[in-house]
Amino acid sequence: MSFDELPKSDGYQEKLVSVTRTAKVVKGGRVFGFAVLVVVGDGKGKVGFGRGKAREVPIAIQKAMDQAKKNMVYIPLSGTTIFHEITWNYGASKVFMKPASEGTGIIAGGAMRAVLEVLGVQNILAKSIGSTNPSNIVRATIGALTHIGTPDYVAAKRGKTVEEVMAG
């Protein structure tokens, strides 16, 4: 499965994750509709996803991009990776992500790769388990990323200094 790079606007990176064709049977035959899933990010820690539905693909893509830009969230990153490993579920989809050392690259499959690329992550190990429905994978990935705690947050929560938290 390849992800199409869409034309850039507003400085955002946009990736088309999936296009689904649906058919409604009417008296005169079939009427086709399209549903698309798009992820949008700035490459610096902001990411969002959107779904668009229309009778034609370009209109559905535009609707999805507008929704994705409205639903963007900020994810704190540790340089080019994440702060700690995390597992997250959405529906029957389960994602596991682990920080990786410099030079590893994005080792992830399916829709997870698209989310991580537009987010700006460059080094990560990721695995999806269970359902590979692109919509659920994208939601699980963004859900996991939003629940990553920065060292400052974890230290404040535990009542310790950042150095004590980082030491173990």
From Swiss-Prot:
Gene Ontology CC annotations of this record: small ribosomal subunit
Alphabetical list of Pfam families matching this protein: Ribosomal_S5 (PF00333), Ribosomal_S5_C (PF03719)
UniProt domain S5 DRBM: residue ranges: 12-75
GO biological process: translation
GO MF terms, alphabetically ordered: rRNA binding; structural constituent of ribosome
Annotated keywords: Ribonucleoprotein, Ribosomal protein, RNA-binding, rRNA-binding
Cystine connections: none
Family stated for the protein in its record: Belongs to the universal ribosomal protein uS5 family.
Functional description taken from the UniProt entry: With S4 and S12 plays an important role in translational accuracy.
NCBIfam families to which the protein is assigned, alphabetical: rpsE_bact
Subunit structure as annotated in this protein's UniProt entry: Part of the 30S ribosomal subunit. Contacts proteins S4 and S8.
Domain notes: The N-terminal domain interacts with the head of the 30S subunit; the C-terminal domain interacts with the body and contacts protein S4. The interaction surface between S4 and S5 is involved in control of translational fidelity.
Designated name of the protein: Small ribosomal subunit protein uS5
Organism: Legionella pneumophila subsp. pneumophila (strain Philadelphia 1 / ATCC 33152 / DSM 7513)
